[in-house]
């Protein structure tokens, strides 16, 4: 019998025809992959906006506010033989980690990116201070894992190597004589993702072009460069 694994996320999840959808591909692939070894229960924030990727799990719950979310965290903590995984540090997941600690449970926190840089991009100078406060406390009461050593900032933790590149991406390799560099970015167009910095770096570079896949319907990207092509989200990866 599989052990239960509760995954807590700050990501928004929409519901349509009893199916659950998210924008962040990691929130789809990580729980689905772990579900092969655990009985995964995914918890997240409810979104009224339709999201892109269907999460193929049987046990998903979404919440309108932090109070109902924490109430379910309390219920989950009663499963004594279960594991608890928190994806990324945000105000929501920060409170969840503290709440689990008060309930006598020690979660695993998975850090996928540098929160210091992301919060600086979002909040300015105060951003790194705000993230440092959450990171310091969370790191002291949790077991950390990350995809990069520098993200841990010297704290003890495990390093893993996740990748979305599977056999579909690698099925037809070619040897090319590269004269012009063609870059591909697949993801959300957000300042904290660094995409605007990349656009500025290649501005006026005639030998470099960038294709961005991830534009949201009805929302301006704010990027207008001749060497950048912006396309809407593509669900089927074989179409890339």
Where are these regions (language model features)?
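Active-site proximal beta-strand in glycosyltransferases
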Residues: 2-9, 100-117, 145, 158-161
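Membrane-proximal helix-turn-helix segments that form the acceptor-binding/catalytic region
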Residues: 29-32, 102, 125-144
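An aromatic- and histidine-rich active-site surface loop
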Residues: 84-104, 109-116, 151-154
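Glycosyltransferase donor-sugar binding loop
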Residues: 186, 209-222, 229-235
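A structural motif in glycosyltransferase catalytic domains
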Residues: 34, 183, 198-201, 210
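A short, active-site helix/loop in glycosyltransferases that binds the activated sugar's phosphate group
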Residues: 46, 131-173
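N-terminal subdomain of nucleotide-sugar transferases
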Residues: 1-50, 200-204
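A conserved mid-protein helix/loop that constitutes part of the nucleotide-sugar donor-binding site
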Residues: 25, 181, 188-204, 220
């Amino acid at each position: 019998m599989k052990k239960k694994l509760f995954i807590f996320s700050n990501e928004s999840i929409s519901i349509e025809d009893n199916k659950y959808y998210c924008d962040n591909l990691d929130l789809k692939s990580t729980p689905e992959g772990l579900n092969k070894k655990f009985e995964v229960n995914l918890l997240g924030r409810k979104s009224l906006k339709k999201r892109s990727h269907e999460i193929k799990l049987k046990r998903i719950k979404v919440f309108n506010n932090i109070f109902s979310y924490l109430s379910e965290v309390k219920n989950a903590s009663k499963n004594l033989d279960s594991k608890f995984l928190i994806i990324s540090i945000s105000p929501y997941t920060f409170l969840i980690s503290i709440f689990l600690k008060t309930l006598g449970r020690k979660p695993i926190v998975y850090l996928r990116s540098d929160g210091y840089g992301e919060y600086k991009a979002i909040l300015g100078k105060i951003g790194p201070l705000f993230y440092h406060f959450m990171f310091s406390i969370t790191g002291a009461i949790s077991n950390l894992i990350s995809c990069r050593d520098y993200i841990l900032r010297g704290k003890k933790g495990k390093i893993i190597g996740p990748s979305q590149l599977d056999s579909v991406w690698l099925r037809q390799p070619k040897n090319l004589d590269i004269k012009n560099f063609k870059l591909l970015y697949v993801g959300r167009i957000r300042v904290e993702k660094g995409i605007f910095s990349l656009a500025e770096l290649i501005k006026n570079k005639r030998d470099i072009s960038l294709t961005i896949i991830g534009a949201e319907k009805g929302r301006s990207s704010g990027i207008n460069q001749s060497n950048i092509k912006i396309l809407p989200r593509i669900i089927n990866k074989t179409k890339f």
